[in-house]
From Swiss-Prot:
Phosphoenolpyruvate binds at residues 148, 163, 166. One of its GO terms (molecular function) is GTP binding. Pfam families: CofC. Guanylyltransferase that catalyzes the activation of phosphoenolpyruvate (PEP) as enolpyruvoyl-2-diphospho-5'-guanosine, via the condensation of PEP with GTP. It is involved in the biosynthesis of coenzyme F420, a hydride carrier cofactor. Belongs to the CofC family. It is an enzyme of class 2 (transferase). The lineage of its organism: Bacteria, Bacillati, Actinomycetota, Actinomycetes, Mycobacteriales. Pathway: Cofactor biosynthesis; coenzyme F420 biosynthesis. This is Phosphoenolpyruvate guanylyltransferase. It comes from the Bacteria.
Length: 214
């Protein structure tokens, strides 16, 4: 997807690990096969919400997974094969840095979005982007306040600090915390409780179908 509108100035990056290794904490409620289906569906709904935001110029998915790559391409996203070598001490942030380099060819303003935001509404992301423009770097925490749902960098280096306790690490790196009321944007999925909370908000069609089929 490439939005050529004059005001479309955001390059959006989503990192996705191998589906077979994703969301193992959902094992109490979903089989391995169903977890893969739900994770892929959440990615589809996340991209689907993001690509309709007028400010988003391009979506780049960085992943080592063929299934995730195919799904992203069908939605019009670009795909970067994750170059992170096996055994890397910080694979997620390495993948994001590689994606940052790739997407800067067309956008100087970059947003990292979690790929498991099935309740994300386009208006929430649009509002968060508007708020983020007031700062060189900013972020939105997850609903627990400890993780990072989105990281924004306008004309400056991304400096991703994702992982456990990432909200505090992004705060310490100088990024400004955005405090808007964006429940869908904050509802990334790690646990069965997170999935229930997202369903209460209302998940996208792909996730709804995958959960119903599980």
């Amino acid at each position: 997807m490439r939005n050529s509108a004059p005001d479309a100035d955001i390059g959006l990056v989503i990192a996705v690990k191998r589906l077979t290794a994703a969301k193992t904490r959902l094992a109490p409620v979903l089989s391995a096969t169903n977890r893969e289906s739900v994770v892929l569906a959440m990615l589809v709904d996340t991209i689907g919400a993001a690509i309709t935001v007028p400010a988003v110029r391009s979506v780049l998915v960085v992943t080592p997974d063929d299934g995730a790559a195919s799904a992203a391409r069908r939605l019009g996203a670009r795909v970067l094969a994750d170059p992170t070598p096996a055994g890397h001490r910080d694979p997620l942030n390495n993948a994001l840095s590689a994606a940052e380099t790739a997407i800067r060819e067309e956008c100087s303003n970059i947003v990292v979005l979690q790929g498991d935001l099935p309740a994300l509404k386009s208006i929430e992301l649009a509002e968060a982007l508007h708020a983020a423009r007031a700062h060189p770097r900013s972020f939105v925490t997850d609903r627990h306040g400890t993780g990072t749902a989105a990281l924004f960098a306008f004309g400056v280096a991304l400096q991703p600090r994702f992982g456990a306790g990432s909200a505090q690490r992004h705060r310490e790196s100088g990024a400004v915390e955005l405090t808007g009321d964006w429940p869908g944007l904050r509802s990334d999925i790690d646990t069965p409780e997170d999935l229930v909370a997202a369903c209460e908000l209302g998940v996208g069609p792909a996730t709804s179908q995958a959960i119903s089929a599980a």
